[in-house]
């Protein structure tokens, strides 16, 4: 599953299934990419999208580590492994490089 990623809406509770390896074939962890929903008609305040996604942690459907993979590490690997300079000059450059080197 190393090169298989899929995008997900921020508030979709089924995102948690990707990290529930006991229910996935071959005990695989699927690589989800946070889809922010910011462009949706029903998003009136962009600042609320990420906290809404974090409700999956608050409801014990995802661990904090799962959430970090969902919103940061998986997207970094998706874009950074195909273009190692993708994050150059951004606020997350240092953290992204650390993920790519791990």
Annotated model-derived regions:
Residues 37:
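Active-site glycine-centered loops adjacent to acidic/histidine catalytic or metal-binding residues
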């Amino acid at each position: 599953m190393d090169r298989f990623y899929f995008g997900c809406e921020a508030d979709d509770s089924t995102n948690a299934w990707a990290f529930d390896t006991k229910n996935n074939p071959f005990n695989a962890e699927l690589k989800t990419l946070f889809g922010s929903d910011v462009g949706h008609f029903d998003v009136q305040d962009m600042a609320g999208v990420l906290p809404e996604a974090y409700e999956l942690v608050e409801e014990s459907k995802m661990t904090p580590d799962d959430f970090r993979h969902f919103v940061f590490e998986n997207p970094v690997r998706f874009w950074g492994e195909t273009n190692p300079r993708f994050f150059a000059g951004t606020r997350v450059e240092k953290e992204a490089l650390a993920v790519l080197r791990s």
